[in-house]
């Protein structure tokens, strides 16, 4: 278990697949949680089970937990979650680059909103993706920027509407 509110995981699933277990992205990600085939294998999804909702959620939570360990230096758990969500979408390397850029340019590398997310967007400009602190090159960050914001907004709606 990752220890996240189930409504946050549901928000991620909705954003990824609109709860459609049969969907395949343009990049080849499959199923409810839109895992890339290689990631699905590494996270334990058996061959041919990519579209199984339970397998997809289990693998996604293992993957999220693994990424969360990479951000253990971020003290605030809500902030850490933003970085994990961004990495789920973008790949961890681009997020590490954006953190390095934020630090270099005087922003808080442990805060997502108005800090690191800004550099995710700027990684589409050569003066940023060619910066010596970047290791992963060009990145079109608008999708990731919106991804985190939309999941957080949907999670807030779910928390408001679904009382436990």
Where are these regions (language model features)?
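Short, functionally critical alpha-helical segments immediately adjacent to catalytic or ligand/cofactor-binding
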Residues: 4-20, 57-61, 84-90, 151
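C-terminal structural cap/anchor segments
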Residues: 57-70, 77-78, 82-83
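Second-shell loop/turn segments in exported
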Residues: 1, 20-26, 42-53, 72-75, ...
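A cross-kingdom marker for long, charged
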Residues: 159-162
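Substrate-binding/active-site groove segments that recognize
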Residues: 22-48, 55-66, 151
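Solvent-exposed coil/turn segments that connect beta secondary-structure elements
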Residues: 15-18, 38-40, 156
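Catalytic and substrate-binding regions of cell-wall glycan-acting enzymes that process beta-1,4-linked
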Residues: 79-157
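Secretory-pathway/luminal and periplasmic proteins that interact with or process carbohydrate-rich
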Residues: 17-26, 67-73, 90-105
